């Protein structure tokens, strides 16, 4: 009978866990819908910012301004990359499957790839889980910030990027990339790697065209060309990080929703298995008691 009591306790414990994981799934689903809407709107703004950026560059080129001296386009002179800063974004919490692990693996892979080319790499971390991992493994992270990936805030993202931009403009780093796990759809996340500095590829490797939505974008230069580029570049760099934070949060809720759904289903299966075991043990106990009773009756005859 002690065995039956143990099985009953296990069934009760698993059912409690099932209720918790189901509740967490519902919460994540609700948060995901909100985060997805924010991500969609933020992406629209990011695309519009890119359109304005291309619009201004196109107008400048049409005016015959080829020699741009903006401080954000230093790669026109700095052709060799020797130092790279990697900004990684992970969650502040766990229970989201391989969400954080996949991001960390990509960071390590990129780090090793750069080091094989004799390129110095510095890490800058956003998110408790990633920062804890690298700290535990003795890997230096230059800048650490928590409670930002779980609550994206433009002002805090802007403040974080100030030091990054200062290091780039002073020559302490030649390239800055952002690595995060992004939202693709309700059930899929994908690792995204984006170069935010240098941004001169807009001129070197692309041929910026005037915006096709002139009725909504009328970016007429006011001030020097370099001032305009500097202003747009600052906004582009800051918003690139902010959008990555929003995109990462949506992906985190998606991953947690899936993880909790899987955990809930596994708990259901385990309850079924334990219930079968309980019924078998109960039947065996009843059979044993009947055999003992019959044996006692026979002994009295």
UniProtKB/Swiss-Prot annotation:
CC terms in the record's Gene Ontology section: plasma membrane; proton-transporting ATP synthase complex
Molecular function as annotated in GO: ATP binding; proton-transporting ATP synthase activity, rotational mechanism
One record GO biological process: proton motive force-driven plasma membrane ATP synthesis
Alphabetic keyword roster: ATP synthesis, Cell inner membrane, Cell membrane, CF(1), Hydrogen ion transport, Ion transport, Membrane, Transport
Family annotation (SUPFAM superfamilies): ATP synthase (F1-ATPase), gamma subunit
Keyword 4Fe-4S: no
Subunit structure: F-type ATPases have 2 components, CF(1) - the catalytic core - and CF(0) - the membrane proton channel. CF(1) has five subunits: alpha(3), beta(3), gamma(1), delta(1), epsilon(1). CF(0) has three main subunits: a, b and c.
Function field: Produces ATP from ADP in the presence of a proton gradient across the membrane. The gamma chain is believed to be important in regulating ATPase activity and the flow of protons through the CF(0) complex.
Name this polypeptide is given: ATP synthase gamma chain
Organism encoding this protein: Helicobacter pylori (strain J99 / ATCC 700824)
Gene name linked to the record: atpG
């Amino acid at each position: 009978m002690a065995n039956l009591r143990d099985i009953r306790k296990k069934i009760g414990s698993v059912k409690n866990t099932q209720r918790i994981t189901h509740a967490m799934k519902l919460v994540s689903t609700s948060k995901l819908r909100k985060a997805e809407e924010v991500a969609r709107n933020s992406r629209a703004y990011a695309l519009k910012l890119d359109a304005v950026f291309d619009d201004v560059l196109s107008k400048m080129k049409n005016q015959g301004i080829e020699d741009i001296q903006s401080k954000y386009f230093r790669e026109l002179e700095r052709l060799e990359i020797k130092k790279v800063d990697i900004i990684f974004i992970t969650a502040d919490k766990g229970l989201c499957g391989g969400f954080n692990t996949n991001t960390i693996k990509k960071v390590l892979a990129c780090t090793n790839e750069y080091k094989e080319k004799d390129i110095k790499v510095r890490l800058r971390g956003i998110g408790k889980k990633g920062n804890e991992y690298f700290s535990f493994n003795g890997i230096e992270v230059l800048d650490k910030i928590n409670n930002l990936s779980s609550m994206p805030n433009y002002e805090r993202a802007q403040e974080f990027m100030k030091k990054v931009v200062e290091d780039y403009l002073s020559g302490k780093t030649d390239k800055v990339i952002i690595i995060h796990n992004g939202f693709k759809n309700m059930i899929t996340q994908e690792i995204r790697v984006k170069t935010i500095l240098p941004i001169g590829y807009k001129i070197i490797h692309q041929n910026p065209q005037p915006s096709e939505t002139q009725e909504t974008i009328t970016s007429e230069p006011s001030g020097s060309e370099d001032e305009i580029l500097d202003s747009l570049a600052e906004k582009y760099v800051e918003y690139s990080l902010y959008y990555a934070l929003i995109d990462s949060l949506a992906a985190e809720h998606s991953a947690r929703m899936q993880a909790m759904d899987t955990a809930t289903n596994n708990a259901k299966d385990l309850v079924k298995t334990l219930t079968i075991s309980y019924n078998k043990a109960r039947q065996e106990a009843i059979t044993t008691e009947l055999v003992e009773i019959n044996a006692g009756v026979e002994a009295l005859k």
